C-alpha cells in the first residue's frame, strides 16, 4: 500500500541498518497480523479493493511527504494515528509476532545466519520502538528501510501488517489501504513486510503487509518486495489483481487488503517517484517494463540491483543465501520478492547483475530469487499468467547448473537453489545428493506447474494457495494455490536466511511430494511372512530398471529397494499402485520411502548383482539343489547372511544354503526349489506344495508344540538332516547342527527311532566322549538344562519380540525342536545308557571328568541340553536373521528398529554360539562364555521354573553350568569374575559351595585352558565355520546332561556330586557337594547359579539384546549404552557394576556403558536378578544366597 511507500527510506534515517531492521520488522509484521488470530479480526476491513484512501495523486503526495522525511505526515487519512483499539490491536499483533519470531527462531537453529537475523529481529521487535512505535508512521518505517530496499520493506511492512488490523489501514476500507499509512504504524519494530510467517500476514486481509519500504524511490525498490501480499487476503487480492503483478502482489491492494503496497491494487503505488509506484501495470502481466523491474523506477532499478537485486539474485545478496526467506517470510516476504518478480508476461528489466536474464531479472525474485530461490518465493502468487510466468521463469545458467547438480566452477560455491555454501567438491556432491537440495529442486520444478516456484530450499513453496504465504506456517500451506502470492522471499534477506527452516515446516504437502520424487528407495510393506525372499523383492524392481541395493526385513515383513534412478523408483511405485504386486497371494504395499533417499547400508554377503544372477539361474540351481538338498552331505551354512542374502537362488546347493532354511522360508524354498516354477508362481502354488506345515506355521506358529512345529517346519529337512546328522555328525557342522536339532525333534516324537540313535551313541564310548565334549562346548554356549528352561523362556521372549515374527519364532522353534529332539535323544540315550549300564554313564562321566568341568557341564547340560538346544536353536534361528537385520537397520517410518534390534542381537548370539561350539572348550572364547551365559540364563530361568520340582537337578545343572561357564570363560576377566562369584558364594556357605568351589576350580581350569588355548582361537575360528560338530557335541552333551538330570535331579544330589567330584574336586569336595545338594540342593543350585547366573542370567536377559560375542558389534554398531543407571556421579562418574571411575559423564554413560566389560557385568547382574526372581517365585530359599552371591559378585566386579 502506499503506506509502504510512505514508509520511504528517507523517512527512516537508519537506512543502513535497514537490513537488520527488515529482518526484524518483517517477522513482526507477519506475526502480528496473523497471530492476532484475529484473522477473524483482521479481516475486519475486508480488503476491499484498496480504494485509495486518497486518490492516487494523494497517495503520491503522501509518499512525497514521507520522502520529505516527514514520518508521520502522511496526508492520508491515516488510521495510523489510530484509535485506542487500533493501538491495542497493534500491541497484540506485536506480541503475536514476537511469539512467531521465537518459534521461527527454534526452526532456524540450524541456520546460523537465520538465527542471527531472528535474534536481531526479536531484539528490535521486542518493542525497540514501543509497540512498534505503534503509530510510527509508515514513513518512519520506510525510512528505516530506505537504504536497503529489502530491509526497508521489512521495516515498514510490519507496520502495514499490524495496521492490517485496522490500525494501519484507514478504516476498514484501508485494508490494503492505498493510504501510505497502511498499517505500518502499528508494527514499526516488527514491521517486516516479510511476514516471517506468511500465515500471519495472510490472516489479516486488510493488512497492508508490504508497503513499508516502498516509501523511498531510490532505496525502496526492495521495499516493495515486502508486501504482505502474502496475506491470505492479500494473496487472494493478488489473485484477482495481481494477475499482472506477480512481482508486486502486495501492491494489489484490492485482494490484499494490505494491498501491501500502499498503492491500491498494484497500480499506483507510485509512492514517491513512482518508484514504489508499482502501478498495476507494473505488476500486471502488463506491468510496464518502465517500472524497472519490480516496478521500481529506474533509479530503483539501481538500488534494486544493490538491494532488491540482491533479493533477486539471492546469491549476491543474502537473499540468495537465506532460503529461509521463502521459508519463513515466504508468504509475505515472498510477496515482496514476488513484486520484483514481474509477471510472466512482463520480464521486468530489473537487471540483476548476477542473473542476467533479460526476460526476468525481476523474476529472479518472484521466480526464485535466483540464488536465494527461497528468497523469492516465486511461488506463482496466482495461477494467472503472472504467476505462471514467475514460477516458470527459466533458471539462470548458474541456477540450472545447481539444479542439475553440476559441479561448480568456483569454490566455495553457494547453491543458488538452496542457498547453501559449499566449500569443496565432496561437500557439493553430498549436498546435491542430500534431501534439502532434492526437495528444493523438486519444489522448483513443481513450481512451474503449480505456479509456485520453489522459493525456499527447504520446503517452502512459493505460492500459498490461500495467499501469498506459500510458506505460511499458519494456514497457507497450499503452495499450489494460484494466489498470486508469488511472494518472493526476497523482502528480507535476514529472514531469508532464517527462513529455511520454515519452508520445510510449511511445505508439508510439498515436501511429501518432494520426498516422493527425490529418493530412489522404494518401501515395500506387507510381505508374506515366511515365504518372501530377497529374490522376490528384487524381482519386483527389476522390470523397472537396475536394482542397486535392497534390504529385506523379514522380522517386520518389509523391504527396501534402491533403484538406480529416481524415475525407475517412481515408475515402480506408480505401476504397483495401479496394479498391486502379489507374492504368495498377499498384496504388497509399495510406495516411495519417505525416509530414505538411498540405502547406504549394504547387506553382508552377496550383493544385489549376485542375487540377480541367482534369480536368473534359479531354475538351474533348483534342479541341482533337489539332489543336494536331500543328500546328507548337503551342509547348511549357519551364517545368517548367506540365507538372507540369497534366499531362493539362495546359496549354492549345499554349503551356501543358509540356516535361514530352518525357518518356514527354508521349507518354502525347498518346495519352491523342488519345483522349478518361478518364484512368483511358487507364491501360492508354493504354499500348496509346501508342507501342510507351511500353512500351520504361518497361521498357527505359536500354537503348535515346539517339537511339533519344528518338526513340521523342518519336517523334510529334519528327517533328511537327521540322516545326515547320524551319518555325518562332525563334517557338516552347520548341517549337523541344524539337522541334529531337527533330528532331535523328530526323534522326540518317534522316540523309539530316536532312542535307537541315542542308544547307539551312548553305547559307543568314543561317541559319548565326543558328545560330552560337544556338550561341554555347547553348555558353554547354552547349558542344556538352562537352555531347556531358557528355551521355554526364549520362546516367550523371542515370541514377544518376534510377535509378528512368527517365522523367527518358528525358526527358533525348529532349531530348538531339533536341539530338543537331540536333547531328548541324548537324554534318552543317556537314560538308556543309565538303564542299560550305569557303567556306560560312568564312562561318560569319566570322559566328562577327563573333560574336567566340561564333563559336569555335559551331564547337567544333557538335561539342560534338550531345553538348551531348543533355546540355543531358537536364539540361533532368531539371531541368524537379526544379524542381517542389524546391518540392514535402515528402518523406514514403520518403527521396525525395535524388532530389528531384538532379532539382531539374538541372531548375533546364534552366530557366535555356532562358532563357539565348533571351538574346543579351551578354544571357546569369551564370546562363547557370554553366549553360554545367555543360554544358561535362559536355562536358569527355565530351570528356575522346573527347579521347584528337583533341587538336586538344579544343583546338577548349576554346577554343570558353572563349569561350562568357566570353561567358556577364556579371558582372565571372565575367569576372575566367575572365581569372584564362586568365592563370594563360597563365603556364604562353604559346605554348600563345594560345588561352587568345584565349579570355580573347573572354571579356572577350563578358563586357563581356554586362555592357554587363546592361541588356538584361530583354529577355533576356523572351526567356527563348521558349527555343526559343536552343535552335535552340545546336543550329545545335552543328552548326557539329560541323563544326569534324570539320575541326579530325581534321584539325589550324591549322584550329582559324584559327577562333580569326577569333574574337578576331590571326593571329599564331591561328598560335601552331594551333601549340600541333598541338604539344600536348591541352595547349592542357587549358589552355583549365583556364581554363574550373573553371567548367564544377565546373558539370558540380554540374550535377546546381544551376546557377548556381539557385544562389541552391538556397542559399536548399535551404539546402545546399556546399564546406564549404574553410572552414578561421584567424584567423577562411577559405575557400580564395574567399579570404574570416569571423569566425564559421556565417557561413563556412552563409552563405558557400551563396553564389553560393562556389558558382561550387567549380564551377570541381570542373571542374578532373574535367578532370584525365579527362585522367589518357586518359593525356595535360594534368593537369600543369590543375593549374597550377587552382592559379592558386584562388589568384586567393582573391585
UniProtKB/Swiss-Prot annotation:
Among SUPFAM superfamilies, the record links this protein to: RNA-binding domain, RBD
Q: Locate the coiled-coil region(s) and give their ranges.
A: none
Annotated phenotype, changing residue 596 to A: Strongly reduced pre-mRNA-binding
Annotated GO MF terms: pre-mRNA intronic binding; RNA binding; splicing factor binding; zinc ion binding
What induces the gene encoding this protein? During early embryonic cardiogenesis.
Phenotype for residue 637 to A: Knockin mice show severe cardiac phenotypes, characterized by dilated cardiomyopathy and atrial fibrillation. Decreased localization to the nucleus, leading to impaired ability to regulate alternative splicing of Ttn (Titin) mRNAs
Q: Where exactly are the zinc fingers annotated as Matrin-type?
A: 1133-1164
Zinc finger intervals, U1-type: 410-444
State the tissue distribution: Predominantly expressed in striated muscle, with highest expression in the heart. In differentiating myoblasts, expression correlates with sarcomere assembly: expression peaks when alpha-actinin is localized mainly in mature Z bodies within the nascent myofiber and expression declines as the sarcomeres continue to mature. Also expressed in kidney.
Question: What spans are recorded as compositionally biased (Low complexity)?
Answer: 25-42, 170-183, 638-649
Main subcellular localisation:
nucleus
Instruction: Enumerate the spans annotated as RRM domain.
Output: 520-595
Q: Which UniProt keywords apply?
A: Cytoplasm, Metal-binding, mRNA processing, mRNA splicing, Nucleus, Phosphoprotein, RNA-binding, Zinc, Zinc-finger
Region annotation (Disordered) maps to: 1-55, 163-186, 320-346, 626-685, 720-884, 944-1077, 1172-1199
Q: Which residues carry this modification: Phosphoserine?
A: 637, 639, 642, 644, 651, 728, 787, 871, 873, 955, 991, 1026, 1038, 1049, 1054, 1058, 1070, 1088, 1093, 1182, 1184
| Region (RS) location | 630-649
Q: What happens when the gene is disrupted?
A: Mice were born in normal Mendelian ratios, are viable, and do not exhibit any visible phenotype. They however develop cardiomyopathy and display splicing defects in genes related to calcium handling such as CAMK2D or RYR2.
Polar residues composition-biased segments: 962-971, 1067-1077
Record note on what altering residue 636 to W does: Impaired ability to regulate alternative splicing of Ttn (Titin) mRNAs
GO cellular component assignments: cytoplasmic ribonucleoprotein granule; nucleus
Q: Where in the cell is it found?
A: Nucleus; Cytoplasm, Cytoplasmic ribonucleoprotein granule
PTM statement from Swiss-Prot or TrEMBL: Phosphorylation regulates the subcellular localization. Phosphorylation of Ser-637 and Ser-639 in the RS (arginine/serine-rich) region promotes nuclear localization of the protein. In contrast, phosphorylation of the C-terminal disordered region promotes localization to cytoplasmic ribonucleoprotein granules.
Instruction: Cite the effect that the entry attributes to residue 639 to A.
Output: Decreased localization to the nucleus, leading to impaired ability to regulate alternative splicing of Ttn (Titin) mRNAs
- The lineage's top-level taxon is Eukaryota
The function of this protein is: RNA-binding protein that acts as a regulator of mRNA splicing of a subset of genes encoding key structural proteins involved in cardiac development, such as TTN (Titin), CACNA1C, CAMK2D or PDLIM5/ENH. Acts as a repressor of mRNA splicing: specifically binds the 5'UCUU-3' motif that is predominantly found within intronic sequences of pre-mRNAs, leading to the exclusion of specific exons in target transcripts. RBM20-mediated exon skipping is hormone-dependent and is essential for TTN isoform transition in both cardiac and skeletal muscles.
Question: Which protein, by its recorded name, is this?
Answer: RNA-binding protein 20
Question: Which gene produces this protein?
Answer: Rbm20
Amino acid at each position: 500500500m502506499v503506506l509502504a511507500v510512505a514508509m520511504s527510506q528517507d523517512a527512516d534515517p537508519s537506512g543502513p541498518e535497514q537490513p537488520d531492521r527488515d529482518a526484524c520488522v518483517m517477522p513482526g509484521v507477519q506475526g502480528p497480523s496473523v497471530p492476532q488470530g484475529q484473522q477473524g479480526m483482521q479481516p475486519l476491513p475486508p480488503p476491499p479493493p484498496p480504494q485509495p484512501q486518497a486518490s492516487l495523486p494523494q497517495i503520491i503526495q503522501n509518499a512525497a511527504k514521507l520522502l520529505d522525511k516527514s514520518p508521520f505526515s502522511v496526508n492520508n487519512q491515516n488510521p495510523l494515528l489510530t484509535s485506542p483499539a487500533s493501538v491495542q490491536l497493534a500491541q497484540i499483533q506485536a506480541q503475536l509476532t514476537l511469539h512467531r519470531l521465537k518459534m521461527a527462531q527454534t526452526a532456524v537453529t540450524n541456520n546460523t545466519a537465520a538465527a542471527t537475523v531472528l535474534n536481531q529481529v526479536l531484539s528490535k521487535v521486542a518493542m525497540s520502538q514501543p509497540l512498534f512505535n505503534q503509530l510510527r508512521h509508515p514513513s518512519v518505517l520506510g525510512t528505516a528501510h530506505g537504504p536497503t530496499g529489502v530491509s526497508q520493506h521489512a521495516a515498514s511492512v510490519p507496520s502495514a501488517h499490524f495496521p492490517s488490523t485496522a490500525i494501519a489501514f484507514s478504516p476498514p476500507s484501508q485494508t490494503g489501504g492505498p493510504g501510505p499509512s497502511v498499517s505500518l504504524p502499528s508494527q514499526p519494530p516488527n514491521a517486516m513486510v516479510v511476514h516471517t510467517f506468511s500465515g500471519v500476514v495472510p490472516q489479516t486481509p486488510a493488512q497492508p503487509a508490504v508497503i513499508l519500504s516502498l516509501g523511498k524511490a531510490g532505496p525502496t525498490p526492495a521495499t516493495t518486495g515486502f508486501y504482505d501480499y502474502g496475506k491470505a487476503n492479500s494473496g487472494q487480492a493478488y489473485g484477482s489483481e495481481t494477475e499482472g503483478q506477480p512481482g508486486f502482489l502486495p501492491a494489489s491492494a484490492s485482494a490484499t487488503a494490505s494491498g501491501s503496497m500502499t498503492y491500491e491494487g498494484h497500480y499506483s503505488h507510485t509512492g514517491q517517484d513512482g518508484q514504489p509506484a508499482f502501478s498495476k501495470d507494473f505488476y500486471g502481466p502488463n506491468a510496464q517494463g518502465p517500472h524497472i523491474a519490480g516496478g521500481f523506477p529506474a533509479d530503483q532499478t539501481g538500488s534494486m540491483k544493490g538491494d532488491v537485486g540482491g533479493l533477486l539474485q539471492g546469491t549476491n545478496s543474502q537473499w540468495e543465501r537465506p532460503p529461509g526467506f521463502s521459508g519463513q517470510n515466504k508468504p509475505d516476504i515472498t510477496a515482496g520478492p514476488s513484486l520484483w518478480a514481474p509477471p510472466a508476461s512482463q520480464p521486468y528489466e530489473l537487471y540483476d547483475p548476477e542473473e542476467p536474464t533479460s526476460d526476468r531479472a525481476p523474476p529472479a525474485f518472484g521466480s526464485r530469487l535466483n540464488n536465494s530461490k527461497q528468497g523469492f518465493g516465486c511461488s506463482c502468487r496466482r495461477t494467472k499468467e503472472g504467476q505462471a510466468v514467475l514460477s516458470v521463469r527459466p533458471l539462470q545458467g548458474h541456477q540450472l547448473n545447481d539444479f542439475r547438480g553440476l559441479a561448480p566452477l568456483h569454490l566455495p560455491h553457494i547453491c543458488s537453489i538452496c542457498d547453501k555454501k559449499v566449500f569443496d567438491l565432496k561437500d557439493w556432491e553430498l549436498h546435491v545428493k542430500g534431501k534439502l537440495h532434492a526437495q528444493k529442486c523438486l519444489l522448483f520444478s513443481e513450481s512451474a506447474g503449480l505456479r509456485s516456484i520453489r522459493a525456499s530450499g527447504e520446503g517452502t513453496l512459493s505460492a500459498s494457495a490461500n495467499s501469498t504465504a506459500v510458506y505460511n506456517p499458519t494456514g497457507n500451506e497450499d503452495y499450489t494455490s494460484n494466489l498470486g502470492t508469488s511472494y518472493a522471499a526476497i523482502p528480507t534477506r535476514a529472514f531469508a536466511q532464517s527462513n529455511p527452516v520454515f519452508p520445510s515446516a510449511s511445505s508439508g504437502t510439498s515436501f511429501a511430494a518432494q520426498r516422493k520424487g527425490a529418493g530412489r528407495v522404494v518401501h515395500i510393506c506387507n510381505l508374506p511372512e515366511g515365504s518372501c525372499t530377497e529374490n522376490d523383492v528384487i524381482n519386483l524392481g527389476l522390470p523397472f530398471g537396475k536394482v542397486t541395493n535392497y534390504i529385506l526385513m523379514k522380522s517386520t515383513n518389509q523391504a527396501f529397494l534402491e533403484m538406480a534412478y529416481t524415475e525407475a523408483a517412481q515408475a515402480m511405485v506408480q505401476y504397483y499402485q495401479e496394479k498391486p504386486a502379489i507374492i504368495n497371494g498377499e498384496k504388497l504395499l509399495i510406495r516411495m520411502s519417505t525416509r530414505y533417499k538411498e540405502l547406504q547400508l549394504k547387506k553382508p554377503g552377496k550383493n544385489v548383482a549376485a542375487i540377480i544372477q541367482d534369480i536368473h539361474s534359479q531354475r538351474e540351481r533348483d534342479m541341482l539343489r533337489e539332489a543336494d538338498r536331500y543328500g546328507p552331505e548337503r551342509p547348511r551354512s549357519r551364517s545368517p547372511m548367506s540365507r538372507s542374502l540369497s534366499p531362493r537362488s539362495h546359496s549354492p546347493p549345499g554349503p551356501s544354503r543358509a540356516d535361514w532354511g530352518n525357518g518356514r522360508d527354508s521349507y518354502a524354498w525347498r518346495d519352491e526349489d523342488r519345483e522349478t516354477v518361478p518364484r512368483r508362481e511358487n507364491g501360492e502354488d508354493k504354499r500348496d506344495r509346501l508342507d501342510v506345515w507351511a500353512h500351520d506355521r504361518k497361521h498357527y506358529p505359536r500354537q503348535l508344540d515346539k517339537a511339533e512345529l519344528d518338526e513340521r517346519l523342518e519336517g523334510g529337512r529334519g528327517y533328511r538332516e537327521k540322516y545326515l546328522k547320524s551319518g555325518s555328525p562332525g563334517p557338516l557342522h552347520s548341517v549337523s547342527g541344524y539337522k541334529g536339532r531337527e533330528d532331535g525333534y523328530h526323534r522326540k516324537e518317534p522316540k523309539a527311532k530316536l532312542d535307537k540313535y541315542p542308544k547307539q551313541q551312548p553305547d559307543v564310548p568314543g561317541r559319548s566322549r565326543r558328545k560330552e565334549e560337544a556338550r561341554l562346548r555347547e553348555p558353554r554356549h547354552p547349558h542344556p538344562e538352562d537352555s531347556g528352561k531358557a528355551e521355554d523362556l526364549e520362546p516367550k521372549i523371542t515370541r514377544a519380540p518376534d510377535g509378528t515374527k512368527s517365522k523367527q519364532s518358528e525358526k527358533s522353534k525348529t532349531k530348538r525342536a531339533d536341539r530338543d529332539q537331540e536333547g531328548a535323544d541324548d537324554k534318552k540315550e543317556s537314560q538308556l545308557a543309565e538303564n542299560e549300564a550305569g557303567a556306560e554313564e560312568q564312562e561318560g562321566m569319566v570322559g566328562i571328568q577327563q573333560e574336567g568341568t566340561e564333563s559336569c557341564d555335559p551331564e547337567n547340560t544333557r538335561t539342560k541340553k534338550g531345553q538348551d538346544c531348543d533355546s540355543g536353536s531358537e536364539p540361533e534361528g532368531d539371531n541368524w536373521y537379526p544379524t542381517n537385520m542389524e546391518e540392514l537397520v535402515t528402518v523406514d517410518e514403520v518403527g521396525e528398529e525395535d524388532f530389528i534390534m531384538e532379532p539382531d542381537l539374538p541372531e548375533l548370539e546364534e552366530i557366535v554360539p555356532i562358532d563357539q561350539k565348533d571351538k574346543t572348550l579351551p578354544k571357546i572364547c569369551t564370546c562363547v562364555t557370554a553366549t553360554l551365559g545367555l543360554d544358561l540364563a535362559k536355562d536358569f530361568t527355565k530351570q528356575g521354573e522346573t527347579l521347584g520340582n528337583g533341587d538336586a537337578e538344579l544343583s546338577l545343572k548349576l554346577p554343570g553350568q558353572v563349569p561350562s561357564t568357566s570353561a567358556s570363560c577364556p579371558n582372565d576377566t571372565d575367569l576372575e569374575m566367575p572365581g569372584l562369584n564362586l568365592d563370594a558364594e563360597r563365603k556364604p556357605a562353604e559346605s554348600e559351595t563345594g560345588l561352587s568351589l568345584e565349579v570355580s576350580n573347573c572354571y579356572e581350569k577350563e578358563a586357563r585352558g581356554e586362555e592357554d588355548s587363546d592361541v588356538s582361537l584361530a583354529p577355533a575360528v576356523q572351526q567356527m565355520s563348521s558349527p555343526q560338530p559343536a552343535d552335535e557335541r552340545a546336543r550329545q552333551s545335552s543328552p548326557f546332561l539329560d541323563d544326569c538330570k534324570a539320575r541326579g535331579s530325581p534321584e539325589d544330589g550324591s549322584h550329582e556330586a559324584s559327577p562333580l567330584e569326577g569333574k574337578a574336586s576331590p571326593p571329599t569336595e564331591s561328598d560335601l557337594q552331594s551333601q549340600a545338594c541333598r541338604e539344600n540342593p536348591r541352595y547349592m543350585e542357587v549358589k552355583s547359579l549365583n556364581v554363574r547366573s550373573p553371567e548367564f542370567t544377565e546373558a539370558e536377559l540380554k540374550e535377546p539384546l546381544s551376546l557377548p560375542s556381539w557385544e562389541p558389534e552391538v556397542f559399536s554398531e548399535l551404539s546402545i549404552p546399556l546399564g546406564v543407571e549404574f553410572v552414578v556421579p561421584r567424584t567423577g562418574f562411577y559405575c557400580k557394576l564395574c567399579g570404574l571411575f570416569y571423569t566425564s559423564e559421556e565417557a561413563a554413560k556412552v563409552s563405558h556403558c557400551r563396553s564389553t566389560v560393562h556389558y558382561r557385568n550387567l549380564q551377570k547382574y541381570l542373571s542374578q536378578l532373574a535367578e532370584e526372581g525365579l527362585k522367589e517365585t518357586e518359593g525356595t530359599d535360594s534368593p537369600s544366597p543369590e543375593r549374597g552371591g550377587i552382592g559379592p559378585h558386584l562388589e568384586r566386579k567393582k573391585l
